[in-house]
Amino acid sequence: MSDDLPIDIHSSKLLDWLVSRRHCNKDWQKSVVAIREKIKHAILDMPESPKIVELLQGAYINYFHCCQIIEILRDTEKDTKNFLGFYSSQRMKDWQEIEGMYKKDNVYLAEAAQILQRLAQYEIPALRKQISKMDQSVTDAIRKHSEYGKQAEDGRKQFEKEISRMQLKGVHLRKELLELAADLPAFYEKITAEIRKISAARDYFQAFRDYMSLGAAPKDAAPILPIIGLIGERGLDVTTYEWKYNQKPDKVEKPNFEMLLTAAEDSDEIDFGGGDEIDFGIAAEDDAVIDFSAVVDLVADDTGAVGEAIASGQDALHLLENSEAQKAVKHELIELLAFLSMRLDDETRETTADVLIRGAEKRPDGVAAVTEKRLKTWITEVEGILKELENPQKVHLFKIRGSPQYVEQVVEELEKKRDMEHRYKRLQTLMTENQETARQSVTKSNVELKTIVESTRVLQKQIEAEISKKYNGRRVNLMGGINQALGGN
């Protein structure tokens, strides 16, 4: 009855089971060393047979391979067989000797058990894990390819939006910026003309203050909008030096902006807009030490020393060119706008008290002559001047005109936006390459896995058959880890 029961052996305990049942010796590995050395030499002298090539390709040669090789040699070496049934071929003798060494003390079973355990516990799971990891790499590469495409498009739109806002072509950024800055004098003339147009609004402000001060402002009162008044009287013929020190300079030495522009035009090799290579590095060391906020002013000594009054650097610029003076101009425009808006609100308020007050009070001509329509016109004109002075493109150009080195900072910022598109496109290309590489690796590993799984199944059946022979043909089942390892295929 017990002879009909199958023998179930856990694959991870197979080698221990064979040793404990005295089928194999504990020191079986000592015999394997000599066998492997014999196989190493025998394999160098093999007949040209497709079957042998297929059998040996990428496989670890074990006892069962040796048996198959001997069967093939029986056909290829049949001419060397004598009448007693023995072979004179050295090839056959070598492999028959190897077979005998394997059978002694069942070394072949111990080695086969060890190979099966290694395949089931390590090689097959590791290969499956590697395939899973590469599958995830393909998925990640596809996702990143899509993300980088969107980021490249966003970078392109940002750059196009920026150069459109600054009215640039985007080819030779430095040259284009300097050319736009070179056109600023015409813009300053236009703003000066518009400020002169609102001189009447300033006069109205002065007249209204005098009226509210019962006829005249105190002698120590601060002048009304002095810079706007100065521009209204003399236009651009006022340097920052004169505004600061209330003294007209004897000599004016303006920064040579035209020379800088000429140098940019002559430097054809400096192309900030073209080139196939993208530089993701840090700017040149010389650029890194430039302090764009630093202003070098060479002015006459205002401590009382006798000498020629020279306006140079920033002080040589007129009031709209100099950043400090322009800021003061904008503050005065905002002050004027606030006053005009307040007066418009007063004039348009229709409460009973306001109507009675306006009917009873006697205003001077300079105040009474200003109508609601005139106030609205002035407000529109002041708002227009402020809008032009605060235009983002003009703000950059003002800084370039006042400090030409600032152009490098603007160019660097624009280049970062432009290079963003190229950078993400290159990353996109890299992800495409990664996808292809990972897919090829997955395909190759799947083929390898299929081959290993098939050879492991064969080895499992061969071991089961050999153990079965030792137990009078009882069925033998190798179970546990081996079935888990093979179950995925």
From Swiss-Prot:
- Keywords per UniProt: Ubl conjugation pathway
RNA-binding found in the keyword field: no
Instruction: Tell whether Transmembrane helix is among the UniProt keywords.
Output: no
A Pfam family in this protein?
CDK5RAP3
> What GO biological process terms does the UniProt entry carry, in alphabetical order?
IRE1-mediated unfolded protein response; regulation of cyclin-dependent protein serine/threonine kinase activity; regulation of mitotic cell cycle
Q: Which GO terms describe its cellular component?
A: endomembrane system
Highest taxon above the source species: Eukaryota
What this chain does, per the entry, is described as: Substrate adapter of E3 ligase complexes mediating ufmylation, the covalent attachment of the ubiquitin-like modifier UFM1 to substrate proteins, and which is involved in various processes, such as ribosome recycling and reticulophagy (also called ER-phagy).
Q: According to its UniProt record, which protein family does this protein belong to?
A: Belongs to the CDK5RAP3 family.
Q: What is this protein called?
A: CDK5RAP3 protein homolog
Q: Which gene encodes it?
A: cdkr-3
